[in-house]
Amino acid sequence: TRLIMVDDIAYFQADNKYAVVMTAEGEALLRKPIRELLDVLDPALFKQIHRSTIVNLKAIASITRDDTGKGTVKLKSRPETLAVSQPFMTLFRNM
Protein backbone atom coordinates (compact mmCIF):
# COMPACT_ATOMS: atom_id res chain seq x y z
CA THR A 1 0.00 0.00 0.00
CA ARG A 2 1.28 3.45 -0.87
CA LEU A 3 -0.18 6.91 -0.57
CA ILE A 4 -0.68 8.86 -3.79
CA MET A 5 -1.39 12.57 -3.53
CA VAL A 6 -4.43 13.81 -5.46
CA ASP A 7 -2.33 16.40 -7.32
CA ASP A 8 -0.03 13.61 -8.58
CA ILE A 9 -2.87 11.73 -10.31
CA ALA A 10 -3.04 12.19 -14.09
CA TYR A 11 -5.98 9.85 -14.69
CA PHE A 12 -7.77 6.64 -13.77
CA GLN A 13 -8.23 3.81 -16.27
CA ALA A 14 -10.72 0.96 -15.83
CA ASP A 15 -9.19 -2.51 -15.62
CA ASN A 16 -11.96 -5.11 -15.33
CA LYS A 17 -13.44 -4.71 -11.83
CA TYR A 18 -10.64 -2.42 -10.69
CA ALA A 19 -9.12 0.90 -11.68
CA VAL A 20 -5.52 1.80 -12.41
CA VAL A 21 -4.34 5.19 -11.16
CA MET A 22 -1.76 6.77 -13.48
CA THR A 23 0.79 9.30 -12.23
CA ALA A 24 3.92 10.85 -13.73
CA GLU A 25 5.97 8.29 -11.78
CA GLY A 26 4.01 5.20 -12.77
CA GLU A 27 0.80 3.38 -12.00
CA ALA A 28 -0.96 1.59 -9.16
CA LEU A 29 -3.95 -0.73 -8.99
CA LEU A 30 -6.99 0.34 -6.97
CA ARG A 31 -9.50 -2.21 -5.79
CA LYS A 32 -12.41 0.02 -6.79
CA PRO A 33 -14.28 0.22 -10.07
CA ILE A 34 -14.42 3.49 -12.01
CA ARG A 35 -18.08 4.10 -11.15
CA GLU A 36 -17.28 4.06 -7.42
CA LEU A 37 -14.42 6.51 -7.91
CA LEU A 38 -16.80 8.99 -9.51
CA ASP A 39 -18.79 9.06 -6.26
CA VAL A 40 -15.78 10.03 -4.12
CA LEU A 41 -13.66 12.22 -6.43
CA ASP A 42 -14.05 16.01 -6.44
CA PRO A 43 -16.07 16.85 -9.59
CA ALA A 44 -14.27 20.20 -9.81
CA LEU A 45 -10.96 18.34 -10.31
CA PHE A 46 -11.86 15.07 -12.03
CA LYS A 47 -14.07 14.45 -15.07
CA GLN A 48 -15.04 11.26 -16.84
CA ILE A 49 -14.02 11.49 -20.50
CA HIS A 50 -14.79 7.94 -21.57
CA ARG A 51 -16.67 5.05 -19.99
CA SER A 52 -13.30 3.68 -18.88
CA THR A 53 -11.37 6.89 -18.11
CA ILE A 54 -11.48 9.67 -15.51
CA VAL A 55 -8.97 12.50 -15.96
CA ASN A 56 -7.54 15.07 -13.55
CA LEU A 57 -8.36 18.43 -15.15
CA LYS A 58 -5.08 19.90 -13.83
CA ALA A 59 -3.15 17.20 -15.74
CA ILE A 60 -4.53 18.19 -19.16
CA ALA A 61 -2.11 19.96 -21.51
CA SER A 62 -4.55 20.23 -24.44
CA ILE A 63 -7.84 18.96 -25.85
CA THR A 64 -8.46 18.53 -29.57
CA ARG A 65 -11.47 17.42 -31.58
CA ASP A 66 -11.51 15.93 -35.07
CA ASP A 67 -14.12 16.38 -37.80
CA THR A 68 -16.18 13.45 -36.52
CA GLY A 69 -16.50 14.97 -33.04
CA LYS A 70 -14.09 12.58 -31.32
CA GLY A 71 -11.82 14.23 -28.82
CA THR A 72 -8.28 13.60 -27.66
CA VAL A 73 -6.67 14.72 -24.41
CA LYS A 74 -2.92 15.30 -24.26
CA LEU A 75 -1.47 15.13 -20.76
CA LYS A 76 1.25 17.25 -19.15
CA SER A 77 2.98 14.42 -17.28
CA ARG A 78 2.33 11.31 -19.40
CA PRO A 79 3.26 10.45 -23.00
CA GLU A 80 -0.02 8.77 -23.98
CA THR A 81 -3.09 10.55 -25.31
CA LEU A 82 -6.57 9.74 -24.05
CA ALA A 83 -9.71 9.33 -26.12
CA VAL A 84 -12.72 11.47 -25.26
CA SER A 85 -15.97 9.87 -26.36
CA GLN A 86 -18.58 12.08 -28.01
CA PRO A 87 -21.03 12.16 -25.08
CA PHE A 88 -18.27 13.52 -22.82
CA MET A 89 -17.03 16.16 -25.30
CA THR A 90 -19.91 18.40 -24.18
CA LEU A 91 -18.12 18.81 -20.84
CA PHE A 92 -15.26 20.56 -22.59
CA ARG A 93 -17.44 22.68 -24.84
CA ASN A 94 -18.91 24.24 -21.72
CA MET A 95 -15.53 24.95 -20.08
Show where each model-derived region lies:
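Conserved binding/recognition cores within well-folded domains
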Residues: 1-81
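Eukaryotic intrinsically disordered, low-complexity regulatory linkers and tails enriched in Ser/Thr/Pro
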Residues: 84-86, 90-95
